[in-house]
């Protein structure tokens, strides 16, 4: 039995029931509760994101402190409501155990197509006080794959206070 993959094999992938699933690479939405055959090149891992997810996407970096996350993309996978708590700390010590970290709670209302970015909670030495969030609602051909997007549905300057966005 040869378990090696050829250059373009079709793999069986089970998508759990109770949700829509969005192909990370293409943005195509698929119904859960089924096994699909996904043809993939050898250098691509099939990844499916549950509809109703918010995925923060930072700059490519070799290590956690390599680049500031002052220009962060939020990929919204529509089809259901979503929540995300963005957690940040100093990256390189245990000060988070003493409360040195921040959280920013976010909520996506799929029906109203609104994103709420709540007040930042907490603080730590060297934290970003201001940043830009670039928001993309993922769809086929938009906000897909592991590259950096160049166009966004909306961008907002965030200064730690609640922002409500209609997308």
Model features per residue range: what roles?
Residues 1-9:
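Single conserved hydrophobic/aromatic residue that forms the stacking wall/gate
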Residues 10-16, 107:
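Long hydrophobic segments that form regular secondary structure
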Residues 12, 22, 114-116:
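General beta-strand recognition
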Residues 15-55:
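Conserved active-site neighborhood of enzyme catalytic/cofactor-binding cores
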Residues 44-164:
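Accessory, solvent-exposed terminal regions and/or long lumenal/extracellular loops of proteins
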């Amino acid at each position: 039995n040869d378990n090696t993959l050829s250059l373009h094999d079709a793999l069986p992938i089970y998508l759990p029931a109770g949700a829509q699933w969005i192909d990370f690479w293409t943005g195509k939405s698929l119904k859960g509760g089924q096994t699909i055959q996904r043809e993939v090149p050898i250098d691509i891992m099939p990844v499916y994101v549950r509809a109703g997810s918010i995925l923060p996407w930072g700059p490519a970096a070799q290590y956690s402190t390599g680049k500031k996350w002052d220009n962060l993309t939020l990929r919204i996978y529509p089809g259901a409501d979503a929540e995300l708590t963005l957690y940040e700390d100093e990256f390189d010590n245990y000060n988070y155990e003493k409360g040195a970290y921040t959280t920013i709670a976010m909520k996506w209302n799929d029906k109203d197509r609104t994103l709420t970015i709540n007040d930042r909670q907490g603080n730590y030495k060297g934290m970003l006080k201001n940043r830009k969030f670039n928001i993309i609602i993922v769809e086929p051909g938009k906000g897909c794959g592991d590259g950096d997007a160049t166009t966004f549905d909306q961008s907002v300057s965030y200064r730690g206070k609640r922002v409500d966005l209609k997308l």
